[in-house]
């Protein structure tokens, strides 16, 4: 399909090179440094160059507050998410001088300026720039960098100055619409002069529509939030969004028709690794066969291990019995062999033989009577044959014998329980193995299902505990507020182990053991929760990684024309501001002249059909078939800088009359400015 576009990551900018020929080519008081200090992007260069040397985002990044700042194109796309990012601007006003200083440091360093700055500076500022913002800028330029002179001007007016010759009368009477990232301004020019008192500002720019588009995508596709960063959303807005050319509501209704909506929509295909289902089925069958082979191999290994163990025990038993047989033929050799085998007495040898027979045949040899006879000999002698001391000793041995019998009884009981548990476990393992061999796929699916149910129960119990903790915390807060009720404040109940929890833990351990045995590729529940495990047999397709932009394509740019209706910002729309705030204040003849020449500048006017929409709206308020010229800046990224360059070249001989020198700054204060075509209104 033609309306499917692949997701492309934003490439990081190339590092700017340091200028090597500043001393020979640019270090001249007659060559101004031009800085278009935009709130979104900064452009800087020399007036004798045809284009700026530096173009970068107006952002400053830091790892820590004490670390060196990363500025300009040294700030890569991947750094934005891990650094603390600051902008010198709030909206389009300078509010953070340290960040602006870092930007100036970057500019002058890349220009190759090592010591004194010999060039004058032209720098753009926002319309109706507050005095305290200009104060920050003047202090930096004159006191920090020792600039000789500076000119302040408005970027949109410089842009108009650079292209006004394209109008038939040189733009004598014109309407300028400057829509940037953060704000939009409307100026009207009468008799080659800007009427600053009638200039209007709207706090909506391209950034507002980008934010709105990003929120819509995040709401519509929450699983794909990470792809749509601010920069990437701005990129797709510039590539795929467009302004309604005429009646917005009528175009909006077109999306009610499924066929038209499909034709007008675009799809962003996010990164996705395509699945070959034929290979997937082959892989599934291979895994099933591998599991069967694994089961057979496990049985074979277990049988082999049991046989080896049995053979080893039989050989050891035969060796010990041969030693015991020496007692009947050669007592002396028997005693020597006992010592060489580290047996202290014949009793130790017999005990080992009995233990081996128990392991091999499961028959217990009763040797306790012999042990008791040797350990408690007085118990087997009549009282009449014992003296008083021996009777006391016999009484003591009887007590010891009773205690020993009790311990042996407990041990036998524990051994029996262990034996039963072991038999039960062996029987369970045997049944599980039979189930696995019968149908490996169904068996593993059942194991995963049982495991998921336990994890769901755990999650539900955890939520209940959190709610209970909130209730307890609120209760303690009420106790603090009410000091009369302080009987058990601060006390914590003993944590009692939940039998159900303990049983679930045992069941989970068994399931993990079985999964590790029959499905080694399975991930332990201790590492990954059930939310992260996809159900067996469920696969994602390319459509699951597609983001469709339909009505959003015209809805987001419309925020400039209907900010209150769409995003709830209590501002006039662009056309409403033009009509009610500017044209209604002008005489009919002047209104006709001003609206005959319209100049569009700023990055936001590059939105598709923006010029057509302005033509449609302005034509509604003009006489039918009256001439109307709408001129859009050739390159909105460089237009203000190029216009400022043209203005500098035109005013080279008049520089002292339009610039503020350091002496002016020191004598007349930071709020002193000189008027020229592109300057703010001077109240001096």
From Swiss-Prot:
Disulfide bonds: none annotated. SMART domains: ACTIN. Residues 392-443, 481-500 are annotated as: Disordered. SUPFAM superfamilies: Actin-like ATPase domain. Residues 262-469 form a coiled coil. GO terms for biological process: DNA recombination; DNA repair; regulation of DNA-templated transcription. It is found in: Nucleus. Residues 402-443 have a biased composition (Basic and acidic residues). GO terms for cellular component: cytoplasm; Ino80 complex. Keywords: Coiled coil, DNA damage, DNA recombination, DNA repair, Nucleus, Transcription, Transcription regulation. Transmembrane segments: none annotated. Pfam families: Actin (PF00022). Belongs to the actin family. ARP5 subfamily. Proposed core component of the chromatin remodeling Ino80 complex which is involved in transcriptional regulation, DNA replication and probably DNA repair. Component of the chromatin-remodeling Ino80 complex. This is Actin-related protein 5. The lineage of its organism: Eukaryota, Amoebozoa, Evosea, Eumycetozoa, Dictyostelia. The gene is arpE.
